[in-house]
């Protein structure tokens, strides 16, 4: 009985290896998004002070509005379309190009709305520079084509970018942020590295999938 169960489990994992690898990679990436900042929080609170750290977190919360706007369900709908048409390169190219153009347009609109909000609300206006730098959170998400890698069931490749970027963020944060005056360095480090990882993952798309981004 135990042997039969073991064989059944082994067969299931063999037949669905790609799907399972994709699932665990997605879970791992999501876990990193939450765990990595938590590791750094004690250090940042101690180095920057509770008030400054609280201000930084309130700005991040503000950016979540624009993060939701630029996502607009692409993570699921686009990934599903990529998966369905993965053998049709021309169709994939149209879908991928359209999604990237839309996300960039939404990002531009979000940036304009963000600036308007910063101008209107005094507590945000007082941290204009911090708001501009923290918008990198939105830009980094737009540049990282999770939906494309997910559609091709290649999230394990993207997870390597995430691991490497988190290691760099952790290292540079500890090396460069030493006083409360260094608080602007954190969004530069964190979101700058995220944007670079996103660009690198986009540059790999033609090589990995044979897909080129074109104007739709």
For each feature predicted by the language model, list its residue ranges.
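N-terminal membrane topogenesis motif
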Residues: 1-36
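C-terminal transmembrane helix end/exit motif
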Residues: 1-7, 15, 78, 144-156, ...
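Transmembrane-helix boundary and interhelical linker motifs in polytopic inner-membrane proteins
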Residues: 13-17, 48-52, 66-101, 150-156
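Alpha-helical transmembrane segments of multi-pass membrane transporters/permeases
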Residues: 22-32, 90, 132, 136, ...
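Small-residue-rich midsections of specific transmembrane alpha-helices
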Residues: 35-36, 40, 57-83, 142-146, ...
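Interfacial/gating helices of multi-pass transporter permease domains
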Residues: 41-66, 183-188
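Alpha-helical transmembrane segments of multi-pass membrane proteins
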Residues: 65, 104-108, 115-119, 123-148, ...
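Hydrophobic alpha-helical transmembrane segments
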Residues: 128, 132-135, 159-209
């Amino acid at each position: 009985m135990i042997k039969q169960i073991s064989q059944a489990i082994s067969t299931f994992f063999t037949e669905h290896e790609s799907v399972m690898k994709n699932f665990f990679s997605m879970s791992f990436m999501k876990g990193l998004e939450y765990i990595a900042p938590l590791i750094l929080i004690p250090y940042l609170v101690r180095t920057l002070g509770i008030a400054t750290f609280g201000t930084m977190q309130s700005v991040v919360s503000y950016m979540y509005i624009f993060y939701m706007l630029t996502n607009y369900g692409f993570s699921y709908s686009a990934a599903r379309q990529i998966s369905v048409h993965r053998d049709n390169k021309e169709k994939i190219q149209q879908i991928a190009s359209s999604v990237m153009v839309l996300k960039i347009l939404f990002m531009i609109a979000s940036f304009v709305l963000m600036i308007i909000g910063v101008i209107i609300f005094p507590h945000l206006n007082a941290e204009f520079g911090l708001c501009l730098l923290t918008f990198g959170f939105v830009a980094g998400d737009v540049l990282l084509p999770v939906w494309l890698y997910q559609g091709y069931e290649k999230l394990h490749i993207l997870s390597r970018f995430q691991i490497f970027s988190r290691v760099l963020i952790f290292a540079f944060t500890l090396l460069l942020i030493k006083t409360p005056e260094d608080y602007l360095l954190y969004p530069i480090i964190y979101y700058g590295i995220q944007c670079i990882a996103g660009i690198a993952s986009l540059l790999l798309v033609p090589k990995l999938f044979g897909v080129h981004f074109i104007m739709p």
